[in-house]
Each structure stands twice: as structure tokens, then as C-alpha cells.
Amino acid sequence: AMYPDVKSTLLGEIARNDLDLALFHEHGVPERQYVTETPRANETDAYYYDAKYRMRQRIRTAVRRGKDAESVIEDIVKKYGITRDWVEDWNNPKTEAEDSLYDAATGIMLDDIAAAKPNVRMTIFDACYNGDFREDDCIASRYILSEGNALVGIGNSVNVLQDKSSSDLMGMLTEGYRVGEWMQQVNILESHILGDPTFHFTASEDAFRPDLHNTNCKYWLKFTSPKYPCDIRGLALHKLYALNYNDLSPLLLKTWKESDEYMLRLQCLHLLEHYNDGNYEKVLKDGVDDPYEFIRRKSA
């Protein structure tokens, strides 16, 4: 539960020394993680303030874009049926300072991270721009370069939320693969490792860790068996595609139909996109009613 509020709760979590992995699904810019729409509200007056704040912000944005403040105020008053006292202090320095603090409470900023001293070993930022290393500073860099035990971040340098599944083959990490080995299988141009690519979690004694350098299709076919973990099977399908295995399309369709594991079926969907034999169309029709929201979205 995000009590007492989202921002302070998350900052407390990333500071925990026993936290191995954090995965953020959020909006972002290089210097900010947008983690909540509104700060903590303890009373009904908080929502009254929020409504007025949003009206004032609308005026400020319009003025920055060259519009006349008075005409914008008149439009707002008319549209929402409010009185002028809701917004007439939009450019009052005291109100602007209060609104700035209110806005800051909705996101995690660079200085917030430095103060939190993150200890989470690995963080995945499924957000735009949080990993934009082209800037002088960015969220992902601040996690690993601040005091604390954070070692690696996976971040994006541009807009990617609609294009990327940040959980693809993540089970490889459970089996003891290094972060860099995992990212070699799933990386896209806009995603980056910031920190130590050799980092890995301790695997159990019965972990499965196939040789990523093996180029024999028969070797990888055995790992498509249901007796292996979901993402090892997904890795095997991925490697078979890379090795141009001739009978992969029917194997993908069969796996799609027989597996109830969402991430494995998502891997089948991704790979079948490369085949023009009718099987992709079959899974798309099934996918629009899939229990997994991301499969439904990709299918539509």
C-alpha cells in the first residue's frame, strides 16, 4: 500500500538494503519520475486546492505560449462556471511557490534520489527519458551514482512506453544470467544499461542456464519443453528464431495454444510477427480477448 503517500513510500522502498529489483511503470523526463497525479489528500479542501491549482497552471501554460492571460481567465470562468477568485492569484509569487511545491510532491526528482541514497541493486525504468544519458544528468544515472548500493539501471532515452515490453525474458535473471546477457536478447535501440552489465542475482542450485553461444537448433529445441521455466522456453524460441530454424512458426503457434503463461505467449506473439504464413493472424484473433492486457493491446 502506498501509505501515507506515493512519493515518500517509493523513496523509502528504494532505500531498503534488502531490495533486489525495482520496476517502475510510469511517465518520465530526464530529471523526473511522474509517480502520482495528485499529492496526498487528507481532507476535502485538498481537492478544492487541486482544482484551483490546475486552473492556474492552465493560465500559466497559455501565457508561456504567448496568449493573453485575461482572455484565458475569461474562457475558464465561462467554461467551468467558476468565479474569478479561483484563478486571479495565478501570478502571485507566494501562490506560485506553493504550487511549485505541490507539483514537486507528485514526482521523484534528482535531488530526491540523492537524498534517498538508493540501495535497490537493479532498477528498470519503463518510462520515457529516465535513462537519457545525453543530458548532463538523468534519473537512472542518479540512482547508481548517488550514495547507496544501487548498481545498475535499465532506462530509455526517448519515448518508448507503447513499443516495449520491459518484462520480456526477465526470468533469465532468476536463473543467474548477467544483466548484460539478458539485455542482449531483448534490447531495443532506445534502451540502455546504466551501471554494471556484469551484475547478476544468485541463482538456485537447480537453476537452468543454457549456453547462449550454442548455435545448434537441436540444443535449443530441448529447452522448449514445458518442463523448463517459462522464460527459458521463451529464450529458446528467441534463439531458434535467431538461428533461422525452419519449423519455428508451427512451434510458436503450438506453444501459444498450449501454454497458459502470459510472458511465453507474448514471446510467441512477438516472433510470429516475422512470418507471413497465416499463423500470426491466428494468434492476433485470439489475442484480442487474452487475459493479459499487454497481449490484448499488441493484438489490437
Listing of model-derived features with the role each one plays in the protein:
Residues 41-54, 173-180:
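Acidic, Ser/Thr-rich peripheral helices and adjacent loops at domain boundaries
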Residues 1-24, 29-40:
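Functional beta-strand-loop-alpha-helix junction segments that form "active/interaction loops"
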